[in-house]
């Protein structure tokens, strides 16, 4: 069994050694331009077209929760990956836990009005504020996949009213489910906090725009943990300036790194982080990949395969 590995920033040698230890029967190598030798599996992140083109692979593993970097290249270079080759993403591998930590900490930050008190501190002003009440602090999760379900579970511990929206209806205990475009407005109408965990597909690009934001209650909050392309940044800034949106926590952006001239850096109602809400944990990723390869070799059914047509 031959495995090729490519990631522009990861510690390649660590990964190769870890994979060799986890899959002793495999010959694992770092892919370099010009390497056309045979391979059974490819582990990749933002791979060059030539790495995958023409290969008879058993499977490709994207080294993250999203596969948009591969699917976008496939649109321009359909020869990059044969339609018969299964494409897998890392469904969790510790990312769910990280998303839970990030989402819960920020929701509580807003719920306890720490954002308002920070503004008071900056102006040396002392004024206790009325508390928010849980029953009026509904949290909506936009995108109800694996990570969305993890976030919902963690927020249930804090007894917030929860709702989710996705392409198809979900049956999560204690979570009100909305499905399809026809139910999006009803979903948004009660969301004091909107958490975006949508996949990046042509249908979801720009979905968080002026029209969507206007359907939220006045003074709502936005937490974007998915992709920057989901948000029309000018529309969000306008909603923040008008007070329609009271605050935003953004981990992802249309351009990354976020350009120094972006007004998001200095906006008093925006907090940003550099795409770190959930990063790939190497040891857990290696365990998932080795387990999945073993299942594939036995012809067993496995989880995490991407539907290329849907984009996730």
Curated annotation (Swiss-Prot):
It comes from Escherichia coli (strain ATCC 8739 / DSM 1576 / NBRC 3972 / NCIMB 8545 / WDCM 00012 / Crooks). SUPFAM superfamilies: NAD(P)-binding Rossmann-fold domains. InterPro entries: D-isomer_DH_CS, D-isomer_DH_NAD-bd, GhrA_Enterobacterales, NAD(P)-bd_dom_sf. GO terms for molecular function: glyoxylate reductase (NADPH) activity; hydroxypyruvate reductase (NADH) activity; hydroxypyruvate reductase (NADPH) activity; NAD binding. This is Glyoxylate/hydroxypyruvate reductase A. Catalyzes the NADPH-dependent reduction of glyoxylate and hydroxypyruvate into glycolate and glycerate, respectively. PROSITE patterns: D_2_HYDROXYACID_DH_3. NCBIfam families: PRK15469.1 (NF012013). PANTHER family: 2-HACID_DH_C DOMAIN-CONTAINING PROTEIN (PTHR43333), D-ISOMER SPECIFIC 2-HYDROXYACID DEHYDROGENASE NAD-BINDING DOMAIN-CONTAINING PROTEIN (PTHR43333:SF1). GO terms for cellular component: cytosol.
